[in-house]
């Protein structure tokens, strides 16, 4: 454990003890949306309404008043206000979201580790994690395995969202805001009764920004620009004396940029030529100059129906959800330095690509790009032509990089039936069943850039304007069957026991959609995994597998006093295994294991992930709830943790999921809040997570390293004001400061590794030993950073609100994500948001 972590953990324990007696400290949960006795926050964390203080688990709650005060709209807003939770979203594309809770991360291209439940319905597509979900009323973030209660992919926790329901009278809200970088937001809702027993809510939102960054070559704001709009409808009706129908529909459309990354090198033996060949990722100056305009499109369609019927002693709930999310991205290629399109082969396409590559290089010789890369007189890699050659890096302004097109389209249908007790007895129970069908197509296509744009077809034959050179394209089908049950027993007035369990069966299959074709640039098959028999390319065979797991959970709660509870829980988390794009293992083996002897273990199928998690904690309050606190400690062992790997080489790029055999996680967490006077609240929280890779057959040298994407600690402090300054005017203000500790993003950390340059140098014009091309990844840890957000304004007559806001007020420079491409010899870096000032106006009616 680091010295800082030990100090913070010790301080947390001391603060927890102090909170029980001091009026200055308490838990950071925000204001109440639904209040019980003595202002208790009411939550549905266990699919039943109960006081937050009674829930035997760590739960962070954002109620309606807190959501408005903090300007929370999406997951990236509330994740930054939650201890032990970090998020990476929108770096590659809008639907690319990874949420990490206490060291368990949702690996890119695998399933999420966090369940998303909106108005009682489980959403299964990871692309929906950071979407707006309508008019928010309350958000609960549960930590630890929640699969027994909330369903699949809840190994790290669950996000439970409640949106606006129609009431007995007409109401609504309109909000507009304007900020720097041509950033505009508009959203609102209207809720109205329909007859005596029904009601309707319609919500809409719009967002536009030019983004923070600029493409110098294209002379346009096409790096992180985005335009999004959505409309949500909800119809709730009593269709019988004890029966309620809840219908929802949603449509959303996004257009923007993709692949907000720069490349950085970590080759220490080249630092004598240029120090930037061995660059600390935290010191990288971001600049953009690709010749291909990056594009990201996302379209979402959803329909759901939920029926709830109350019997005399039990409630039956049944729902169904149809979801269709299509995603596409277009961007520049990554591999000009490996000369895939540089030298002509015996095909017209290869000649055309080579001519374009040489011509654009000659035209752009000397054009300034990020050091240590440069555009020389020719596109020949400088290690083969030290006098006139080039070092492009990724996303250069020449056509030598090629192009990339990626799609991720998913349609799914899910349904659940749940029967739960509905009495005041000491024994409560629920039982149910769940079904899910997923049809998902993913594709990654690398094509030649002939200066004529990028095709939206994954496969473009030889002779086309954007001929395909490498293709991974698969259809994934999944059927999920699950049964679950739970029992909650109030043993006496102070002691309760809960037991829950869920059994999942996931049938998965994959079929390759890659045609049997040769690559016009390398002469091999369009997918290196395709066999060639008697000169004829063969299709990749179908694969299938079934994954099964029982997920038990046990929780204990003891009421020490009327104001203090202690609890403990243990549970098993589960994420199904699955398939990478077929041919991935062959690409890695041919380009890395056989060429430079890395012995990286990548399979076309990745294993299921399971975790065993234990948590114990204490929750308390004082002064009629004005002071609240909770302190928790946890330990988790993860077997076969799923981890995203990114490979770059002469083949282009490759995205795969691998497994880390065993990871140990443990830590502590503290939340404190105090209402100093009526209308003035202060709050704070801290999390420390220690992690260690215990076994990793995929990369054995990484044993002893930390869990990737896991911050060493997070600290949140803030204050909120709502004070009268006149008969009908209130002064409102909120400040939130979040510190995120050092973070590794890969299993390879303080480790050297051979790269493709190690294999190329001995045969190059430089004739250097292979070891000169080895990389050192000790410079890839993201540093600690802190972000301050401030909102100040007036509320008039409880209806009209004017707020000035600043995001990242101190203009802190930080990294959103680091993706080391180990055998490439560098990393792909995505920047965090810069400072932005704006004004927001809202009207309630």
Give names to the regions the model predicted.
Residues 32, 493-494, 628-638, 656-748:
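Gram-negative outer-membrane beta-barrel transporters
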Residues 96, 112-113, 125, 134-137, ...:
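Outer-membrane beta-barrel translocator/receptor signature
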Residues 304-333, 559, 565-571, 582-583, ...:
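Membrane-embedded beta-barrel scaffold of Gram-negative outer-membrane proteins
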Residues 1-70, 76-82, 241, 303, ...:
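N-terminal Sec signal peptide and the immediately downstream disordered periplasmic leader
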Residues 44, 76, 80-121:
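Extracytoplasmic beta-strand/coil segments of soluble accessory domains associated
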Residues 738-757, 793-845:
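C-terminal beta-signal and adjacent terminal beta-strands/loops
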Residues 236-240, 419-422, 428, 432-436, ...:
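Structural signature of Gram-negative outer-membrane beta-barrels, strongest in the C-terminal barrel
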Residues 212-222, 259-291, 334-405, 445-473, ...:
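Solvent-exposed loop segments that connect transmembrane elements
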């Amino acid at each position: 454990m680091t010295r800082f972590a030990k100090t913070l953990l010790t301080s947390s324990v001391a603060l927890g003890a102090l909170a029980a007696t001091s009026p200055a400290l308490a838990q950071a949960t925000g204001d109440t949306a639904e209040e019980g006795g003595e202002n208790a926050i009411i939550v549905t964390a266990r699919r039943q309404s109960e006081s937050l203080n009674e829930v035997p688990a760590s739960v962070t709650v954002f109620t309606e008043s807190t959501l408005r005060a903090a300007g929370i709209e999406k997951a990236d807003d509330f994740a930054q206000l939650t201890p032990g939770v970090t998020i990476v979203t929108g770096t590659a594309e809008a639907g690319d979201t990874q949420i990490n809770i206490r060291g368990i991360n949702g690996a890119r291209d695998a399933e999420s580790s966090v369940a998303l439940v909106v108005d009682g319905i489980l959403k299964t597509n990871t692309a929906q994690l950071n979407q707006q979900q309508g008019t928010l009323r309350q958000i609960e973030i549960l930590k630890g395995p929640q699969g027994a209660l909330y369903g699949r992919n809840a190994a790290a926790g669950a996000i439970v969202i409640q949106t606006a329901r129609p009431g007995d009278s007409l109401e609504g809200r309109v909000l507009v805001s304007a900020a720097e970088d041509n950033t505009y937001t508009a959203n609102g809702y209207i809720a109205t009764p329909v007859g005596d027993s029904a009601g309707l809510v319609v919500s809409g939102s719009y967002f536009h920004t030019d983004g923070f960054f600029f493409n110098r070559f294209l002379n346009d704001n096409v790096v992180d620009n985005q335009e999004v709009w959505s409309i949500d409808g909800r119809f709730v009706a009593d269709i019988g004396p004890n029966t309620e129908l809840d219908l929802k529909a949603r449509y959303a459309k996004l257009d923007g940029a993709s692949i907000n990354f720069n490349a950085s090198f970590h080759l220490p033996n080249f630092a004598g030529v240029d120090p930037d060949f061995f660059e600390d990722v935290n010191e990288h100056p971001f600049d953009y100059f690709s010749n291909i305009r990056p594009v990201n499109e996302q379209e979402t369609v959803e329909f759901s129906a939920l029926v709830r019927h109350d019997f005399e002693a039990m409630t039956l709930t049944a729902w169904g959800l149809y979801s269709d999310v299509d995603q596409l991205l277009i961007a520049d290629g990554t591999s000009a330095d490996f000369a895939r399109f540089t030298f002509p082969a015996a095909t017209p396409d290869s000649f055309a690509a080579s001519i374009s590559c040489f011509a654009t290089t000659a035209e752009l010789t000397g054009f300034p790009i990020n050091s240590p890369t440069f555009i020389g007189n020719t596109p020949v890699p400088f290690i083969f032509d030290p006098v006139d050659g080039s070092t492009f890096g990724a996303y250069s302004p020449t056509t030598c990089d090629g192009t990339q097109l990626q799609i991720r389209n998913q349609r799914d249908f899910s349904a659940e039936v749940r029967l739960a007790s509905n009495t005041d007895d000491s024994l409560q129970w629920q039982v149910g069943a769940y079904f899910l069908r997923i049809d998902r197509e993913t594709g990654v296509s690398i094509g030649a850039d002939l200066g004529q744009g990028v095709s939206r077809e994954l496969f473009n034959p030889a002779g086309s304007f954007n001929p395909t050179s490498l293709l991974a394209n698969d259809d994934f089908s999944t059927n999920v069957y699950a049964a679950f049950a739970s029992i909650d027993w109030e043993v006496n007035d102070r002691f309760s026991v809960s037991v829950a369990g869920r059994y999942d069966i996931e049938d998965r299959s994959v079929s390759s959609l890659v045609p049997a074709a040769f690559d016009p640039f390398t002469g091999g098959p369009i997918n290196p995994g395709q066999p060639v028999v008697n000169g004829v390319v063969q299709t990749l065979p179908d694969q299938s597998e079934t994954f099964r797991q029982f997920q038990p959970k046990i929780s204990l709660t003891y009421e020490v006093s009327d104001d203090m509870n202690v609890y403990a829980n243990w549970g098993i988390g589960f994420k199904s295994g699955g398939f990478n794009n077929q041919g991935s293992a062959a690409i890695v083996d041919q380009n890395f294991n056989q060429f430079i002897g890395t012995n990286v273990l990548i399979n076309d199928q990745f294993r299921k992930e399971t975790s065993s998690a234990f948590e114990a904690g204490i929750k308390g309050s004082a002064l009629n709830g004005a002071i609240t606190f909770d302190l928790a400690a946890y330990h988790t062992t993860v077997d076969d943790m799923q981890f995203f790997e990114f490979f770059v080489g002469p083949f282009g790029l490759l995205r795969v999921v691998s497994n880390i055999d065993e990871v140990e996680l443990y830590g502590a967490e503290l939340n404190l809040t105090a209402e100093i006077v009526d209308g003035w609240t202060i709050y704070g929280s801290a999390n420390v997570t220690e992690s260690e890779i215990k076994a990793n057959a995929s990369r054995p040298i990484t044993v002893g390293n930390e869990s990737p994407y896991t911050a060493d600690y997070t600290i949140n402090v803030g204050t909120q004001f709502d004070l009268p300054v006149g008969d009908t005017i209130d002064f409102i203000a909120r400040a939130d400061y979040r510190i995120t500790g050092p973070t590794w993003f890969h299993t390879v950390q303080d480790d050297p590794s051979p790269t493709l340059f190690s294999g190329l140098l001995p045969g190059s014009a430089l004739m250097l030993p292979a070891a000169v091309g080895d990389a050192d990844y000790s410079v890839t840890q993201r540093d600690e950073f802190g972000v301050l957000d401030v909102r100040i304004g007036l509320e008039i007559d409880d209806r009209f609100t004017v707020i000035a806001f600043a995001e990242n007020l101190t203009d802190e420079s930080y990294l959103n994500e680091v993706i080391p491409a180990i055998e490439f010899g560098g990393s792909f870096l995505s920047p965090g948001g810069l400072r932005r000032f704006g004004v927001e106006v809202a009207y309630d009616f």
